[in-house]
C-alpha cells in the first residue's frame, strides 16, 4: 500500500517539463509492513494530478525483515534543495534527515542520512527565522489496549536553529503537549504543524498543532478524527 503523503511547493524539472509541487509518501510491498520506502510524485498544481517519479524509490531500503523508511515530511531549504525528515530503522533511526538536491529530477543529489537524536520516530518539524519546532508522537502511559500501535501524547518542543540537530546533547525545550488529560482521549497521535506551503511558520506568535485522537477497544477505528491545539508562543518567547 501507499500512505502518509506530504505535499510541498517546490519547483523542479522532469522530462523537459516544469512542476511546482512535490509529494513524498510511504510505499510498502509486503503484507507484514516491512520494507517501507519513500517515493516521490510531482504536479503542476496542488490539487493534482500527481505523476509518480519513474525512478522511485527516492529513499530506498533493502532489508525486508525491518520496518524501513517512511512517514516523511519536507522543509524547503532553498530553490534547489529540500530537507527530508523521516522515520527510519537504519542505524541512524528512529528519526532522520537528509538534504536532497531535487530541482532537476534527472540529476538528483541524495545527501547522507543524518540521525536526529532525542526525538521519537513520528516527529514533524516546522521552521521560523530563529527556531525549529517539532511535534512528536510519544508514549507516556502503558499502551495495553488496542490501538497499541499509536501513542497517547503529542509533544511540542523547539530549539534555536543555531543549534546542531544532530548534536549529542538534548537541547529540545518543551512548550506543551496534547495528552489524555487535555483532549479527553486515551490515544493522541500523528501530529503535524500548520505551516505555509514550504514548511515554515505562519506566525511567530502562535503555533497550531493538528493531531488525531482515538478511543481504545473495539470502536477505536470509528473514533478517528482531526483535532487541533493552539499554543501561544508569546508567553514562551518574551
Give the positions of each predicted feature.
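Beta-rich carbohydrate-recognition and catalytic domains
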Residues: 1-3, 8-67, 75-121, 126-186, ...
Amino acid at each position: 500500500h501507499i500512505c502518509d503523503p506530504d505535499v510541498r511547493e517546490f519547483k523542479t524539472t522532469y522530462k523537459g517539463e516544469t512542476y511546482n509541487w512535490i509529494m513524498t509518501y510511504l510505499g510498502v510491498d509486503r503484507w507484514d509492513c516491512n520494507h517501507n520506502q519513500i517515493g516521490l510524485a510531482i504536479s503542476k498544481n496542488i490539487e493534482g494530478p500527481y505523476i509518480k517519479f519513474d525512478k522511485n524509490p527516492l529513499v530506498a531500503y533493502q532489508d525486508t525483515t525491518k520496518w524501513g523508511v517512511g512517514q516523511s515530511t519536507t522543509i524547503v531549504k532553498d530553490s534547489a534543495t529540500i530537507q527530508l525528515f523521516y522515520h527510519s530503522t537504519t542505524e541512524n533511526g528512529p528519526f532522520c534527515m537528509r538534504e536532497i538536491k531535487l530541482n532537476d529530477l534527472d540529476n538528483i543529489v541524495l545527501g547522507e542520512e543524518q540521525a536526529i537524536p532525542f526525538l521519537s520516530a513520528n516527529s514533524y518539524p516546522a521552521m521560523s527565522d530563529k527556531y525549529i519546532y517539532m511535534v512528536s508522537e510519544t508514549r507516556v502511559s502503558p499502551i495495553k489496549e488496542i490501538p497499541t500501535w499509536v501513542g497517547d501524547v503529542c509533544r511540542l518542543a523547539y530549539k534555536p536553529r543555531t543549534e546542531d540537530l544532530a548534536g549529542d546533547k538534548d537541547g529540545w525545550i518543551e512548550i506543551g503537549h496534547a495528552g489524555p488529560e487535555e483532549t479527553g482521549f486515551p490515544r493522541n497521535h500523528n501530529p503535524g504543524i500548520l505551516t505555509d506551503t514550504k514548511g515554515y511558520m505562519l506566525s511567530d506568535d502562535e503555533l497550531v498543532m493538528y493531531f488525531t485522537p482515538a478511543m481504545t477497544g473495539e470502536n477505536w477505528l470509528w473514533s478517528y478524527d482531526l483535532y487541533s491545539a493552539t499554543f501561544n508562543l508569546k508567553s514562551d518567547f518574551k
